[in-house]
């Protein structure tokens, strides 16, 4: 009986150690790439927002000009549909431990903004041995 208890105690110890170790296997932590809107409160008369993307990782990242917007409605995020839209071709690079400010146009001719909470969504690529795509979001308020 003592051997069985010892076996299970050791088994749980090693399993918990392996699970804790696996959490640290990710090369880039979830908060190593951060985006924010500056300033985060704007008037509805604004034509664009400025996003500041911070690359706190150990790898260079890149992103295109494409972005999405969502509005917070009825306690959930709802996509804003701009319909068919062409995007300027281009790639922005952000070196490790650096940041970059980009403009995101609100495209008011395609959507009528009302005061409320919004967020911008961009996709970045982390340029490590195997490229990793990551979604980053930043909230802002239109008054």
Name every feature range the model reports, one short phrase each:
Residues 13-15, 72-74, 107, 114-115, ...:
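Alpha-helix boundary/interfacial micro-motifs
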Residues 1-25, 118:
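Bacterial Sec-dependent N-terminal signal peptides
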Residues 6-7, 11-16, 53, 81, ...:
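Intrinsic disorder/low-structure terminal segments
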